[in-house]
């Protein structure tokens, strides 16, 4: 065998050297081929980690969650439950089935007091960043909202999958524990997911279409089907040019008890857009300097920014007053110019919709007619109305409009997005109105809860924000809280009730409602509803809605208001002022301001109920009081207790028997 000299002085046989060279060559080829793995592309289309092997066995929607890393945050504390950690994790959703998934929604069940600071590739439905995800949160696609199938895209992962890179803060987990979510699942209608499987810092699940739930028969849609919540906003692009487009925003109130007064709408431009002109609404701030010193000012050098409506990233928008409705420049638009009033459709369908238009200018690289992106992070609020929580804009099929020519033709929007907002239940001490209870069988009134509408604006060092309110004589409900102290102390002394050294704080509500049980007899009962306005402005077209629970079907009549049952249960009744009495005036000074307390605006009526066909109704034990009460759509804080019926108080009797007793007594007096 022939040998070859090597510089090191070692002799290697030729066939061994040849084999070694071939091995190195093949290894390099294998290395290069492995570099082009079947990865998950990110936003830039680049490859990512290799998909887990479990995905190969999934015929449906595959989802995974991988915990990445964490780092201890300041301040460093010894208490493990109070220590915060910065963490990074990734989630993935892949359409591994044969059916396109429109408007995907992935729920991640966080459970370690997570605060989500940012996420790429998706948008949380539950609010804006930083987002409290202690009880989990749902992500939706942004910009990739729909997941096509591998079959129709030739396995293009940019169209069948989405990656979510999550950054946030978590609490209360020691170093030895990997903080994983409780679960991950798909929340789209018609899909079901088994329990997620976990291994170390990873978990995955394969969700499949529920065969028992048949797809609703209807028109096929190119984009996600429209959903309907309490408040529905549609963002329609009507005209599109290279550098700008005309959009129309339509707000529909679809909740029978929902309402907005003087609504304020905000959203966030994500790509440097700005509002050039508006019709049907206006922005609260118009500052040309914000435009001049922004990217818009650098690009649009010849544009007169003194005439531009708004260049804020988060503009605040409000409806125009009625006098602007026929204005040629800012009005002349259906459903506009109502001073921000959105009534329930059950009250007035013509006042349950608002509309405005805006001309939006774009910046590079979006300078073409098809580069259309809606603003994100929508929020809407009113003066004394329910709190709404809005989801992200979801692409839907273009809206249809009647042709302006009057012909039997239909005009379509270029693109449409829908934002669904739902009413949230007020948190404790965060309502905007409150309720007090009183009854004919008890001398004391149960006032509104302490700090029912919050105590952020008062000095809680001088009062107790957590104690129960003091019982009051009923006439004390007619005066402001500041004028009740002497009455409350005197009443407590008279009725031998304790008075704490530190008195309870006020309720701090602009509107309060008193519910007084007036009578209770064999076949029915009555109550008196009184609405107090402690604000300095009036409420137009006000309404009160009550849910009477078990007693609701017994509603008979209201004598000074209009009363309407709310279907389908008919346990809720909505009351509104009669014509000419639809204004709840504001608070005014007393006859002598130096001596007399302010006088609230007031509306009052008696309401009658029957006990027919309602078994086991006990008025004093709670059946005679509302289980929920709403003022202008806002759920008001209810007292924690009912007025108690003393054991010595006689039981209620029927009206007919009362009349008989009165007649006998009168006859006896005449005989004397």
From Swiss-Prot:
Glycosylation sites: 79, 135, 264, 328, 339, 368, 422, 442, 483, 562, 570, 589
Span of the signal peptide: 1-35
Tissue expression: Expressed in roots, stems, leaves, flowers and siliques. Specific expression in the pollen tube.
Keyword Membrane assigned: yes
GO cellular component, one term: plasma membrane
Residues where lipid is bound covalently (GPI-anchor amidated serine): 646
Entries under Pfam families matching the protein: COB_C, COBRA
Keyword match NADP: no
Residue span(s) of domain CBM2: 502-607
Propeptide: 647-672
Keywords, ordered alphabetically: Cell membrane, Cytoplasm, Glycoprotein, GPI-anchor, Lipoprotein, Membrane, Signal
Disruption-associated phenotype: Gametophytic male sterility due to reduced pollen tube growth and compromised directional ovular guidance cues sensing in the female transmitting tract, thus leading to an abnormal pollen tubes guidance growth toward micropyles. Normal pollen development, hydration and germination. Disrupted apical pectin cap and cellulose microfibrils deposition in pollen tubes resulting in an abnormal cell wall organization.
Membrane topology qualifier: Lipid-anchor; GPI-anchor
Protein name: COBRA-like protein 10
Phylogenetic lineage: Eukaryota, Viridiplantae, Streptophyta, Embryophyta, Tracheophyta
Primary gene name: COBL10
């Amino acid at each position: 065998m022939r040998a070859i000299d090597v510089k090191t002085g070692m002799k290697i046989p030729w066939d061994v050297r040849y084999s070694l060279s071939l091995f190195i060559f093949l290894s390099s080829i294998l290395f290069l081929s492995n570099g082009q793995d079947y990865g998950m592309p990110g936003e830039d289309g680049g490859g990512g980690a290799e998909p887990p092997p479990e995905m190969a066995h999934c015929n449906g929607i595959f989802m995974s969650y991988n915990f990445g890393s964490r780092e201890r945050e300041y301040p460093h504390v010894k208490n493990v439950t109070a220590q915060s950690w910065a963490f990074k994790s990734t989630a993935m959703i892949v359409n591994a089935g044969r059916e396109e998934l429109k408007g995907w929604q992935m729920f991640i069940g966080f459970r370690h007091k997570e605060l989500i600071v940012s996420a790429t590739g998706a948008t949380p439905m539950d609010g804006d960043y930083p987002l409290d995800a202690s009880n989990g949160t749902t992500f939706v696609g942004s910009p990739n909202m729909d997941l096509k199938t591998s079959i129709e895209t030739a396995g293009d992962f940019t169209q069948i999958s989405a990656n979510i890179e999550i950054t946030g803060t978590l609490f209360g987990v020691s170093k030895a524990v990997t903080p994983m979510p409780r679960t991950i699942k798909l929340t789209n209608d018609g899909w079901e997911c088994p329990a997620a499987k976990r291994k170390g810092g990873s978990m995955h699940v394969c969700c499949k279409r529920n065969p028992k739930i048949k797809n609703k028969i209807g028109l096929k849609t190119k984009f996600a089907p429209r959903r309907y919540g309490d408040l529905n906003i549609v963002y329609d692009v009507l005209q599109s040019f290279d550098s700008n487009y005309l959009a129309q925003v339509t707000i529909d109130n679809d909740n029978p008890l929902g309402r907005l007064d003087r609504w304020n709408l905000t959203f966030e431009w994500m790509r440097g857009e700005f509002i050039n002109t508006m019709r049907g609404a206006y922005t609260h701030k118009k500052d040309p300097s914000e435009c001049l010193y922004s990217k818009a000012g650098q690009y649009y050098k010849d544009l007169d920014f003194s005439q531009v409506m708004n260049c804020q990233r988060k503009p605040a928008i409000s409806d125009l007053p009625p006098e602007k409705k026929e204005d040629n420049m800012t009005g002349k638009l259906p459903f506009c110019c109502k001073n921000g009033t959105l009534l329930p459709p059950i009250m007035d369908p013509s006042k349950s919709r608002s509309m405005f238009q805006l001309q939006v200018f774009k910046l590079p690289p979006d300078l073409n007619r098809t580069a259309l992106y809606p603003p994100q992070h929508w929020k809407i609020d009113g003066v004394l109305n329910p709190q709404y929580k809005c989801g992200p804009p979801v692409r839907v099929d273009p809206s249809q409009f009647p042709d302006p020519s009057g012909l039997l033709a239909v005009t379509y929007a270029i693109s449409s997005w829908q934002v669904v907002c739902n009413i949230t239940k007020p948190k404790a001490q965060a309502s905007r109105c409150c309720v007090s209870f009183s009854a004919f069988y008890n001398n004391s009134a149960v006032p509104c809860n302490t700090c029912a509408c919050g105590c952020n604006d008062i000095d809680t060092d001088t009062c107790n924000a957590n104690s129960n309110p003091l019982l009051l004589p009923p006439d004390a409900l007619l005066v402001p809280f500041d004028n009740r102290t002497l009455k409350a102390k005197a009443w407590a002394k008279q009725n031998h009730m304790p008075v704490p050294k530190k008195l309870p704080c006020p309720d701090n509500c602009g509107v309060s409602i008193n519910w007084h049980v007036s009578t209770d007899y064999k076949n029915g009962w009555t109550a008196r509803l009184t609405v107090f306005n402690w604000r300095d402005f009036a409420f137009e077209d006000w309404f009160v809605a009550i849910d009477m629970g078990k007693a609701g079907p017994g509603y008979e009549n209201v004598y000074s208001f209009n009363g309407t049952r709310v279907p389908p249960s008919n346990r809720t009744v909505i009351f509104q002022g009669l014509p000419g009495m639809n204004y709840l005036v504001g608070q005014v000074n007393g006859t002598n301001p130096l001596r007399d307390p302010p006088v609230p605006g007031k509306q009052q009526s008696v309401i009658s109920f029957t006990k027919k066909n309602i078994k086991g109704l006990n008025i004093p034990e709670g059946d005679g009081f509302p289980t929920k009460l709403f003022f202008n759509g806002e759920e008001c804080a209810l007292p924690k207790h009912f007025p108690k019926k003393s054991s010595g108080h006689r039981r209620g009797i029927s009206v007919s028997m009362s009349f008989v007793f009165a007649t006998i007594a009168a006859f006896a007096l005449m005989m004397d």
